[in-house]
């Protein structure tokens, strides 16, 4: 039996967006636990660390002046001002992962996804996760037991706004069963990894196959 063939490929910038409570965080965690070829993009932020958060693991914590300078220098693939704090995706570590054939997972909203697509185009795959109903979304938010009625109402209003941008994504999934939705997300990732334009070693491999046949009539 011949040895298996491994072709070099370019990584995927995999965006997973959803309203709060629709399952994005759970699915992201499952992806990172099960697939060692994908890494979570660590954002920079000006907000202070929360208890248990580690600099460089959960976020890169920077002051406002540092963040502004990074933005002015083009050091971010995307950034936004959200609830009084700035958040951004550092460019250099993402480009290093891509070049090494690693995939990068982004937990960002529709605005971040739009900016990222404008910057990185063909490398970006955008997936939006919808709840089965708004009633189910509210039930999930209340089941957390962490938010007041006022906060939940604000989250529901924000969710409606986020859902209105569903058509800016390449794939849209309905999460009525988290295991099935996770399977669909992974099917998308596997298919995107196999796209011809990402198989950077494919041209040379095909050329070698053809040249191994004497007198082959080929344009290669």
From Swiss-Prot:
SUPFAM superfamilies: P-loop containing nucleoside triphosphate hydrolases
Family: Belongs to the guanylate kinase family.
Organism per entry: Sphingopyxis alaskensis (strain DSM 13593 / LMG 18877 / RB2256)
Keywords: ATP-binding, Cytoplasm, Kinase, Nucleotide-binding, Transferase
Catalytic activity: GMP + ATP = GDP + ADP
Primary enzyme class: transferase
Major location category of this protein: cytoplasm
Signal peptide per UniProt: none
E.C. number(s) listed in UniProt: 2.7.4.8
InterPro entries in UniProt: GK/Ca_channel_bsu, Guanylate_kin-like_dom, Guanylate_kinase, Guanylate_kinase_CS, P-loop_NTPase
Recorded GO CC terms: cytosol
Record gene name: gmk
The Guanylate kinase-like domain, residue ranges: 11-190
The protein's name in its UniProt record: Guanylate kinase
Highest taxon, organism lineage: Bacteria
GO MF annotations in UniProt: ATP binding; guanylate kinase activity
PROSITE patterns: GUANYLATE_KINASE_1, GUANYLATE_KINASE_2
Localization terms from the record: Cytoplasm
Cited function: Essential for recycling GMP and indirectly, cGMP.
Binding-site residues, ATP: 18-25
Keyword Kinase (UniProt): yes
